[in-house]
């Protein structure tokens, strides 16, 4: 199953009871709205299929896990409704991960920026390579990590999230991210990453379905309001991205 997008892809591959959902975009695995919609739909569909016991979320390529929002699309936003619609795409992906009654394992092979940190935070268990540095860059482009913030704070705590959000031009190492709870494991390279992810997915696929559902619900307790919260946060980002300041910063990045 391969949802069609204008550029890039979201692909779903079943390996027994394990579903691998992979996204790719030629611009550093950035996420335009069509890929976000396809990703949310794939996670929801696979997560509610009884034949699937665990989901692995991954990206194509070997250098960058996810570059965050598509700057090309951000530069095209002219109305608040457009901004809300775009940032709601990230909200929908995070909420899809939260709502499915299956564990979602993250495979992070390289750098995660902005929304990419949000994806790594939203998965139930994240394994990364030593190259998987993280950065919340939103403030530097005149916005802020409003949509992904709740997921990052839930996983790493307010202090670590604040450091990332305020130091918006600085990468933090994979070791730092592991120390602060984002990554459960950090391995040397892609081969070790695949081995660790596959081993965990196989173990989880063999666990009790009923116990998995109960544990996932318990782990996400207190986030029941995120359906509304993340859309409220998307509205903030959607308003800010239209400002002259944000658009000038976005254009400066695109012109590099």
Residue ranges and their predicted role:
Residues 1-58, 95:
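Conserved CoA-thioester-binding segment of acyl-CoA-metabolizing enzymes
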Residues 2-22, 165, 169-204, 211-224, ...:
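Amphipathic alpha-helical segments at domain termini/boundaries
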Residues 21, 39, 57, 70, ...:
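Terminal peptide-recognition signature
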Residues 36, 71, 90, 149, ...:
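A general structural signal for well-ordered alpha-helical segments in protein cores
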Residues 42, 89-100:
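Catalytic-core regions built around general acid/base machinery
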Residues 59-93, 112:
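Glycine- (often His-adjacent) and acidic-residue-rich active-site loop
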Residues 96-208:
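Crotonase-fold acyl-CoA enzyme core
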Residues 232-236, 240, 251-252:
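Intrinsically disordered, low-complexity segments enriched in small/flexible residues
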């Amino acid at each position: 199953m391969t949802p069609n997008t204008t550029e890039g892809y979201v692909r779903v591959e079943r390996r027994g009871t394990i579903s691998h959902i992979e996204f790719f975009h030629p611009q550093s695995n950035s996420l335009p709205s069509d890929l976000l919609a396809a990703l949310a739909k794939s996670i929801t569909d696979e997560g509610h299929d009884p034949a699937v016991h665990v989901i692995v979320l991954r990206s194509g390529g070997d250098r960058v896990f996810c570059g965050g929002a598509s700057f090309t699309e951000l530069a095209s936003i002219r109305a608040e409704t457009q901004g809300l619609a775009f940032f709601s795409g990230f909200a929908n992906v995070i909420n899809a991960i939260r709502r499915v009654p299956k564990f979602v394992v993250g495979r992070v092979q390289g750098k995660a920026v902005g929304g990419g940190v949000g994806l790594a935070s939203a998965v139930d268990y994240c394994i990364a390579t030593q190259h998987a540095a993280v950065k919340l860059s939103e403030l530097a482009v005149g916005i802020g990590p409003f949509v992904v913030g709740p997921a990052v704070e839930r996983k790493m705590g307010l202090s670590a999230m604040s450091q990332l959000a305020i130091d918006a031009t600085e990468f933090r190492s994979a070791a730092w991210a592991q120390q602060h709870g984002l990554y459960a494991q950090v391995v040397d390279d892609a081969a070790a990453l695949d081995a660790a992810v596959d081993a965990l997915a196989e173990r989880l696929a063999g666990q009790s379905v009923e116990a998995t559902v109960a544990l996932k619900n318990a782990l996400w307790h207190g986030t029941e309001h995120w359906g509304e919260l993340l859309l409220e946060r998307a509205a903030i980002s959607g308003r800010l991205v239209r400002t002259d300041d944000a658009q000038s910063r976005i254009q400066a990045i695109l012109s590099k």
